[in-house]
From Swiss-Prot, chain B:
Keyword Translocase attributed: no
Stored Pfam families: DUF444
Record protein name field: UPF0229 protein mll9637
PANTHER family reported for this sequence: UPF0229 PROTEIN YEAH
NCBIfam families in alphabetical order: PRK05325.1-2 (NF003707), PRK05325.1-3 (NF003708)
Length: 514, 436
């Protein structure tokens, strides 16, 4: 190893970059990643952009193509404001879960940073996107860009045909329900090709034109009394509408009585984009951890082999440590647990447990402790876990001690917090479980479902909010969101809050009162 | 080898459209915020610069979110040094969560829009307009102002443009090769020299030739004038129509004993608003202040609002005074005439009929718009809010109201009423037409 290192020369020198250097560095890093970490990646497409373009990309939820909406403009102005004031730096990179995997490089970056970005994004994130089961099952990397292209032009066409205001109203309402617009347990269908979409839309429009059973509003014939709403009929009705339904956007798209076909299509677009981002929200720690682990390992290896200079390595390390900085809870800089730091630490911990376990590790992780094949363990974890299960499975007592993690129990009606557990023998399991729980997107979001609607009666849409741990919805934004649902549904919308444990009704709110 | 694409030369500002959409939306919020401010802070506020913060969440994007003030939670935090299980930590002030430490809130800056005085007023008056303004302007273009518009080949002698004329003549003289005086002089000198010499046949011949040349040049000089009529250029003037954008506002106020400080204050606020509005809309705005008790007098602004004087009430005197001033100083052809009258509605018995007559016969034909604002007691507002009943003046004016569409009347009981009423009075009224 040492003799080989002596022989080899630097990959690059100086801080300027050019395309030849980038290509050389990429090839080297890719070969190293495949050889040393066994990575498996989508082909890479690297795009060099300026900082302004980075701001643009930032504000349209990181996608290269996005339909137009004022909220993206707001994000842009806000990001730009912070950037101009120096309150926030720009990300050095942006990577898109698509095939080929698109990596944005900023032209302002130095060569050392570009190398870091390549290792981090083009290999780390890329591997994660391609192999993690959530992304494999739930997102269609090959189809997303063409879908976004379609969405953008479709919405632009709607704006031309129906006016900005009309489109904006639908988008505003749909955006308000984005978090309630994903299937959590059912896998969404694969994104269809342009042709299929066209066919689908035509069919939709045809259905709309032709008779719609739901719209039958003839008064009952005089001789016949109105059928009683027996349990049987109720059950039948729920079954025909596939209730309860947790995906509010989906329900509205399919069943709303007032929406035009183009409005349904827009809701569908918002829903599909929400669904596309759902896995990303569940895998922040893992995704960033994976990318950080990969760049840290690869950069150090390159340095050990004398392929990068000490100066470049220092710059890389400085950026690396900025990214994984984790202030303590009482530090003014603290905002939350840094997913880069937690992910990297856990993955390095797995490496340590595999190669140099303590007795405690052998107790806690009998499967992997001392087996030495940390690489396979990591590849397996990257492929098969999301944040919640990853923390639940791999957060070790060593790490809990190192981070000095502790748990506060916070009850709104108490004047104080209680320290429920700290990093000791009795606390490890509890802390691990609570931290895992906090990464469970499904559990930490309000659980709201459509439970019933009487299509033949007053057409009131009835929602149910299952209240866990007594956490209610914030009043003002709840009312505003209900109004948005009403816009899409066209008739009264009411929501009851039921306690998850006791089943007691905590509150009821209808758009009639708002 | 990966694919590289250089996107740096791609168009920037991909989000320009998004930003425009956002600003258009923010404008609505700005408008609302300005209105609220003015309503709360008084009309004087209106005439200043404003900084209007729009919270980042301001242009709302609501979602179903947890109420931070309810329920039971667990927070996992790093960096414990001092606590052990079971310790109790008091929550910081008033249960606002563990501040940022709980990882739930991020401090967020607001957008701040700094609006100049003009922008504030523009937002404030955006959809207000004085009725009938456009129509009058289109109908009567009354004065013209001459404006230089190049040169003409014909015109009055006073308008000759000497510079341009001489330039033309100079060019023509060069083009037609008009002999110069110097050439003639030179030949004359030669002739004189030859004549001084002893005469010989050769000399005589030379002299004859020179004389002939001189003669030819002189004839040519006569043919080609120094200044020819074709050279002459006149300044050309175009008459330009001047828009008739003058407005005069008559402020009529009852200052009899029944008008207390509160009533005057309300009236003043209404007039201030009207004045701001008129200065905004017209190039030139005059205000005439007329106060009346049983006698009416034109006064200056300060006296109008602050002078204390008392007496009986004869409203018609103010109307007569107004009519007199219009006749004297404001020819209807040139001025848009507006009037706002504020009163508590008390009037001398029998005078109200005279008021009707004055308005009906004279003033309403002259006025573009006449607004009557009756200031009533707050306790009366719920009684009279919507009824036709009221003071003698109110009942009398009701008759005028029905007859003249450019007459409007409203009641005001509190400062908060002023702006809505003002808006009602001056909202765009497409079908408002001056009859006869």
């Amino acid at each position: 190893m040492v003799s080989q290192a002596r022989k080899s020369e630097l990959l690059f020198s100086g801080s300027d970059w050019n395309f030849a250097k980038l290509a050389r560095v990429y090839d080297e890093i890719e070969a190293l990643g495949l050889e040393k970490l066994g990575l498996d990646i989508y082909p890479v497409q690297m795009e060099v952009i300026s900082s302004e373009q980075m701001l643009d990309a930032y504000s349209s939820v990181g996608m290269p193509l996005m339909y137009r909406h004022w909220s993206f403009g707001k994000r842009f102005l806000y990001d730009e404001l912070l950037y101009r004031k120096g309150a926030r730096g720009l990300a050095h990179e942006l990577v898109i879960n698509s095939s080929p995997c698109i990596v944005y490089l900023m032209e302002e970056n130095t060569m050392a940073l570009q190398a870091l970005v390549i290792a981090h994004a083009a290999l780390g994130h890329n591997h994660f996107f391609k192999n993690n089961h959530l992304f494999r099952q739930w997102t269609d990397a090959g189809g997303i860009l063409s879908y976004l292209d379609f969405a953008k032009s479709y919405i632009a066409r709607c704006e031309e045909r129906h006016g900005l205001t009309a489109v904006e109203a639908i988008l505003d309402s749909a955006h308000a329900l984005m978090e309630q617009g994903v299937f959590r347990y059912r896998r969404p269908p694969k994104l269809s090709s342009e042709q299929q979409r066209e066919g689908l839309r035509e069919r939709l429009e045809y259905e709309e034109r032709s008779f719609n059973d739901l719209l039958r509003t003839l008064p009952p014939s005089p001789g016949k009394s109105k059928p009683e709403a027996t349990d049987e009929i109720l059950a039948e009705r729920k079954k025909s509408l596939k209730l309860p339904e947790e995906n509010l956007l989906y329900f509205l798209e399919k069943n709303s009585l007032v929406l035009e076909p183009w409005q349904r299509e827009i809701i569908r677009i918002v829903r599909i984009i929400a669904q596309y981002f759902y896995p990303q929200q569940q895998t922040q720690v893992m995704n960033e951890g994976c990318a950080t682990f990969v760049h840290y390992t690869l950069m150090n290896t390159l340095f050990d082999r004398c392929r990068i200079s000490e100066g470049a390595m220092l710059e890389i390390l400085r950026n690396h440590s900025n990214a994984v900085f984790q202030p303590a809870y009482d530090d003014p800089r603290y905002s939350r647990i840094n997913p880069y730091a937690l992910g990297l630490d856990m993955m390095q911990d797995i490496q340590r447990i595999s190669t140099a376990p303590t007795a405690e590790d052998r107790d806690w992780f009998p499967d992997i402790a001392g087996r030495g094949d940390w690489r396979d363990t990591l590849l397996d974890a990257w492929a098969n876990h999301r944040d919640e299960s990853f923390v639940r499975q791999y957060l070790s007592p060593t790490l809990i001690r190192k981070w000095r993690l502790f748990m506060l129990a916070d009850s709104a009606d108490e004047p104080h917090y209680e320290v429920a557990s700290i990093h000791n023998e009795r606390g490890y399991a509890k802390i691990r479980s609570a931290l895992a729980q906090s990464y469970d997107v499904g559990a930490s979001r309000p659980d709201i479902q459509v439970i019933d609607v009487d299509l033949l009666g007053d057409r009131r849409l009835r929602l149910q909010h299952t209240v866990k741990n007594g956490i209610m919805l914030e009043g003002a934004s709840r009312d505003a969101t209900l109004r948005h649902i009403r816009n899409l549904w066209g008739y009264e919308v009411s929501m009851v809050a039921l306690d998850a444990e006791t089943g007691a009704m905590l509150s009821e709110r209808s758009t009639k009162e708002i | 080898m990966p694919i590289f694409i250089d996107r740096r030369l791609n168009p920037k500002d991909k989000s320009l459209g998004n930003r425009q959409r956002f600003l258009r939306r923010a404008r609505e919020e700005l408008k609302r915020s300005i209105r609220d401010k003015v309503r709360a802070g008084g009309i004087a506020e209106l005439d200043r610069e404003h900084v209007v913060p729009i919270p980042r969440k301001g242009t709302g994007e609501p979602t179903f979110g947890d109420d931070k003030e309810s329920g039971r939670r667990q927070h996992i935090l790093p960096g414990n040094r001092t606590f052990s299980s079971g310790d109790l930590i008091p929550k910081p002030g008033g249960g606002g969560g563990y501040g940022s430490a709980a990882g739930t809130t991020e401090s967020e800056d607001d957008f701040r829009f700094v609006l100049s005085r003009e922008e504030v007023l523009d937002l404030f008056f955006e959809d207000l307009e004085l009725p009938d303004l456009v129509k009058l302007n289109l109908k009567q273009v009354l004065s013209f102002k001459p404006r230089r518009a190049g040169f003409a080949a014909s015109g009055a002698p006073t308008n000759i443009n000497v510079g341009r004329t001489m330039r033309n003549s100079h060019g023509r003289r060069i083009a037609l090769r008009r002999p110069k005086q110097a050439e003639l002089d030179a030949i004359a000198r030669q002739i004189a020299e030859l004549e001084a010499k002893p005469a010989s046949a050769l000399v005589r011949e030379r002299i004859a030739a020179l004389r002939e040349a001189l003669d030819r040049l002189e004839r040519r000089r006569k043919r080609i004038a120094y200044v020819d009529p074709v050279d002459i250029r006149f300044n050309r003037f175009d008459p330009q129509p001047l828009p008739n954008a003058n407005a005069v506002m008559f402020c009529l106020m009852d200052v009899s004993g029944s008008m207390g400080e509160r009533e005057k204050d309300l009236a003043k606020r209404f007039f201030v608003l009207l004045h701001l509005f008129l200065t905004r809309r017209y190039e030139r705005t005059d205000i005439v202040f007329i106060r009346h008790t049983h006698l009416a007098k034109e006064v200056d602004e300060h006296t109008f609002f602050y002078h204390t004087e008392s007496g009986g009430t004869v409203v018609s005197t103010a109307l007569e005074e107004m009519h007199r001033i219009i006749e004297q100083r404001y020819p209807v052809a040139e001025w848009n005439i507006y009037a706002a009258q504020a009163s508590d509605g008390d009037n001398f018995a029998g005078d109200s009929e005279r008021c009707i007559e004055l308005l009906d016969r004279k003033l309403m034909r002259l006025c573009q718009y006449f607004a009557y604002v009756e200031i009533i007691d707050e306790r009366e507002s719920h009684i009279f809010g919507a009824t036709e009943n009221g003071t003698s003046l109110w009942r009398a004016y009701n008759a005028v109201d029905g007859k003249w569409p450019n007459f409007q009347m409203r009641r005001i009981a509190a400062p908060a009423d002023i702006y809505p009423v003002f808006r009602q009075l001056f909202a765009r009224q497409p079908d408002l037409r001056k009859s006869a």
